[in-house]
Amino acid sequence: MATIKEIKEFLVTVKELESPIFLELEKDNRSGVQKEISKRKRAIQAELDENLRLESMLSYEKELYKQGLTLIVGIDEVGRGPLAGPVVAAAVILPKNCKIKGLNDSKKIPKKKHLEIFQAVQDQALSIGIGIIDNQVIDQVNIYEATKLAMQEAISQLSPQPEHLLIDAMKLDLPISQTSIIKGDANSLSIAAASIVAKVTRDELMKEYDQQFPGYDFATNAGYGTAKHLEGLTKLGVTPIHRTSFEPVKSLVLGKKES
């Protein structure tokens, strides 16, 4: 008779809930065996559910595949709201019907999984472009226009160039057909891929800035207006990476000029 450990190792090879192997093993009344059967069935169901979720996030891409298009780029940005640091956009072309387990809107991915999924996107993508627009340009042209500039910069880095753009709630002045999707990072795998690339890229930049400008907690808050960040602003003042067109940074700068 096989040991429970041997059965556990064997069950990993079972890929279907309807497998006759389950029926056979269910005759074994050892509680440990029954526990492993239930555990494996849950794992198979979770894999099926994940596959369905990923399939549903390819609906926009599949419509474009039907039109004969394959070089479809997802575009997203991170960093429109922070008080400090750049806005970062990413453009990602995935292979046709590519599915990356766990890929989702970066806000829905557990932080501990960010680097793993970022690496999976890097490994599988046909091309990746990254656009970074700093705080000085943001202050000059406004955050909306700066976001568009970051997206255009990211697209310009792609090789091959895309046949169609899938963009998260934006439209770009480019001679390429495009689809603007509300909550695109939750509804398109291509945009979700861009979302995690932009997120990890910007987070790493803000960790570097945290070394240059200690006291604002940039490594943790990524430039957003948390209590620690605001405390740093009050005690230490404005850094060269702060957005002086954003409040309360703007008032701090004006107050300093007036005093």
Swiss-Prot record:
It is found in: Cytoplasm. GO terms for molecular function: manganese ion binding; RNA binding; RNA-DNA hybrid ribonuclease activity. Its EC number is 3.1.26.4. Keywords: Cytoplasm, Endonuclease, Hydrolase, Manganese, Metal-binding, Nuclease. It comes from the Bacteria. InterPro entries: RNase_HII, RNase_HII/HIII, RNase_HII/HIII_dom, RNaseH-like_sf, RNaseH_sf. It catalyses: Endonucleolytic cleavage to 5'-phosphomonoester. Its cofactor is Mn(2+); Mg(2+). CDD domains: RNase_HII_bacteria_HII_like. Manganese or magnesium. Binds 1 divalent metal ion per monomer in the absence of substrate. May bind a second metal ion after substrate binding. Residues 70-258 form the RNase H type-2 domain. A divalent metal cation binds at residues 76-77, 168. GO terms for cellular component: cytoplasm; ribonuclease H2 complex. GO terms for biological process: DNA replication, removal of RNA primer; mismatch repair. Belongs to the RNase HII family. Endonuclease that specifically degrades the RNA of RNA-DNA hybrids. This is Ribonuclease HII. The lineage of its organism: Bacteria, Bacillati, Bacillota, Bacilli, Lactobacillales.
